[in-house]
Amino acid sequence: MSKAHVVGLGKSGVAAARLLKREGWEVVLSDSNTSDTLLKQQQELAKEQITVELGYSLDFAGALPDLIIVSPGVPWDIPDLVKARDLGIETIGEMELAWRHLKSLPWVGITGTNGKTTTTALIAAIFQAAGFDAPACGNIGYAACEVALAEIPPDWIIGEMSSYQIESSVTLAPHISIWTTFTPDHLARHKTLENYYDIKAKLLRQSHLQVFNGDDAYLSKIGASHWPDAYWTSVQGKESLLGEKGFYIEDGWVVEQLPNSPPQRIVEASALRMVGAHNLQNLLMAVAAARLADISPNAIDKAVREFPGVAHRLEHICTWEGIDFINDSKATNYDAAEVGLASVKSPVVLIAGGEAKPGDDTAWLAKIQAQTSAVLLIGSAAPAFAQRLKEVGYTHYEIVETMEKAVRRSLELAKHHQAPVVLLSPACASFDQYPNFEARGDHFRELCLELVGEKETNSNHH
């Protein structure tokens, strides 16, 4: 019996283990951590004859596995995995395993630094409105292997793919691939910008059709020469379209331009309820995917009008006395946080901080100076951010450390400055105080609703 070893006990790892088990593999699933939750999962999986090793790393002394599957959150270049590859053990990502089971079906692959999640969710919504069974998977929705485990295979697979997932996928070749934006984000893992670009480019090279965001400075600069057959998008109209074919916005409409045919209006840009120019870029890419899959403008229009947006991405939580509380916890880098500030009404009371990431904060700091009346700093980045704000001559900041304090103080400051918006847009990872950005956003949501509930109760008593 062939032996497989799955690294990482998240939902992706568990789904991969179940898929391999079903195929007749002997499966060990390991995680370097241990906790009550993991111990409970260990007992559950034992009933399915899947061995779970906790607080464990790969052991090269005993019998070696024939195949190693790596969960999306596990760095591709940790010593264990480098050693496994040097020993000639086939080592692939969970997404690649799913692809091997589902490669007879058409995939849409979405990658990029920012904008992936919204674009993926919108594409899935459009395909579903057109009557397709088209689950979103990968970084959002299901783990890719959960889709592979389904009794009845879907019509399309809409996969959000991080650079880690692409790096660990050897043969993954979607029918349509989309590259949303390219900014130096995950450099800790990928060492250099070129390396990070090459990884993402691999996905598009292996795809049948490519769609690029032509409004992204980096992609448009290198794009036309590298990708002569691609479809480009631009929110700035036909003049800004790279190449002969693509999708652009003109007179408030998304317009399709294909070779040898007149431009065709597909959907009104105002049909999308989400705020911000960057969401029009996401809309264009989603429409491009839908049209390349021959989906009718009617289905596109219906899906776009009904699309609610994405949690943790400029998510409107509540309004109290004219002050909007907005959760943008997904803004884990300077670029995304700058977009967040640009997309809401100003002046803003901004909550920022967490675990800082490398990057250029210049544009973000300028946006803070232009748009905010106060900044509340949380998490381990707070002292460094305070220092940076001081250096650019911005003094309306306070270090509050925790989300609880930040939310309470934000309401006081918003009232004082008559600011219409309290915005959580951290520009940081969340790992100093939370398991992930979702947990951070959920906590913010909870605190806002609690605070507003309290205020309403109090005002009813007077």
Curated annotation (Swiss-Prot):
Domain of life: Bacteria
UniProt-listed Enzyme Commission number(s): 6.3.2.9
CC per GO annotation: cytoplasm
Localization of this protein: Cytoplasm
Catalytic activity: UDP-N-acetyl-alpha-D-muramoyl-L-alanine + D-glutamate + ATP = UDP-N-acetyl-alpha-D-muramoyl-L-alanyl-D-glutamate + ADP + phosphate + H(+)
Residues annotated to bind ATP: G112, T113, N114, G115, K116, T117, T118
Pathway assigned to this chain's UniProt record: Cell wall biogenesis; peptidoglycan biosynthesis
GO molecular function: ATP binding; UDP-N-acetylmuramoylalanine-D-glutamate ligase activity
Major place of residence: cytoplasm
InterPro entries reported in the protein's UniProt record: Mur-like_cat_sf (IPR036565), Mur_ligase_C (IPR004101), Mur_ligase_C_dom_sf (IPR036615), Mur_ligase_cen (IPR013221), MurD (IPR005762)
Listed Pfam families: Mur_ligase_C, Mur_ligase_M, MurD-like_N
Gene3D superfamilies linked: Mur ligase, C-terminal domain, Mur-like, catalytic domain, NAD(P)-binding Rossmann-like Domain
SUPFAM superfamilies: MurCD N-terminal domain, MurD-like peptide ligases, catalytic domain, MurD-like peptide ligases, peptide-binding domain
A biological-process GO annotation: cell division
Top-level EC class as recorded in UniProt: ligase
Record key words, sorted: ATP-binding, Cell cycle, Cell division, Cell shape, Cell wall biogenesis/degradation, Cytoplasm, Ligase, Nucleotide-binding, Peptidoglycan synthesis
Family: Belongs to the MurCDEF family.
Function: Cell wall formation. Catalyzes the addition of glutamate to the nucleotide precursor UDP-N-acetylmuramoyl-L-alanine (UMA).
Descriptive protein name: UDP-N-acetylmuramoylalanine--D-glutamate ligase
Record lineage: Bacteria, Bacillati, Cyanobacteriota, Cyanophyceae, Nostocales
